[in-house]
A protein has these predicted regions:
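Phosphate/nucleotide-binding beta-alpha loop and adjacent structural elements of enzyme active sites
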Residues: 1-239
Length: 239
């Protein structure tokens, strides 16, 4: 576990420089006071980062993993936010229901999708993490699922300044669950993996086409360090 923590901390340090580019973009193009949706919150790293540069009118965190959620809850409570925030131990998709999350021991790779154990990329990752048995890499945990539309309607939310999605290959399903309330969403900021480690059953072109059809345009693209992944920001042309 120490070695896995060391790997994660090293990646977090490297990602800091990537995140500076993201923050710079939003400081230039967004309001100082924001309503923020963090889908795939993990331990609250993104909330902590944005809280240093923006004032939250309110924020909503979604973390499907009950294990990750306990750490998220502790970390957010320690930040002592005075404005409204909502911590949701639930997965998001295109419908309401139940499912499973594959909880990895390197917790940031946890995903609702299945892993492709024939993937050379995954085999290399397991080797780096010194995991020799696939079954020791993850365990299945039952979770509840809802959609963004369902949540937004229940909470009577009328504006989202930034919707961030980082759900390890489940991003497209979450975007499909925003078929009504995309109209109130200014920016969608998400990560897309081009490796074959996870069985996504969609391509980046599917996300791009869907967002274009909803009236969004791509305004930012940046490759993440040491990974076959990119971060994208799309802006609603009608807000």
């Amino acid at each position: 576990m120490f070695f896995i923590s060391l790997i994660r901390n090293s990646l977090n340090f490297i990602d800091y420089f990537q995140q500076k580019k993201i923050i710079k973009f939003f400081k230039k193009n967004s309001n100082k006071k924001i309503i923020f949706f963090d889908v795939g919150s993990h331990y609250g790293e993104t909330i902590k980062l944005f809280s240093k540069e923006f004032m939250f009118e309110q924020f909503h965190c979604f973390e499907a993993s009950p294990i990750n959620f306990e750490e998220l809850k502790k970390n957010i409570e320690n930040l002592n936010f005075k404005n409204k925030y909502y911590l949701n131990n639930i997965g998001l998709g295109y419908d309401v229901g139940e499912g499973f999350i594959n909880q990895t021991y390197e917790t940031s790779s946890s995903t609702i999708n299945d892993f492709n154990f024939d993937s050379k990329y995954l085999k290399r990752k397991l080797k780096i993490l010194n995991i020799k048995n696939d079954k020791k890499f993850y365990k299945k945990i039952p979770i509840k699922l809802t959609s963004l539309d369902n949540y937004i309607n229940e909470k009577k939310i009328n504006k989202i300044d930034i919707l961030k999605i980082d759900t390890e290959g489940y991003e497209y399903n979450i975007i499909k669950g925003l078929s009504q309330n995309y109209k109130i969403t200014k920016f969608i900021y998400f990560e897309h993996h081009y490796d074959d480690m996870i069985k996504k059953n969609y391509k980046f072109s599917n996300i791009n086409e869907t967002l274009k059809n909803l009236g969004f345009k791509k305004v930012f693209k940046s490759k993440m360090y040491f990974r076959k992944s990119f971060e994208y920001i799309y802006e609603n042309k009608f807000i």
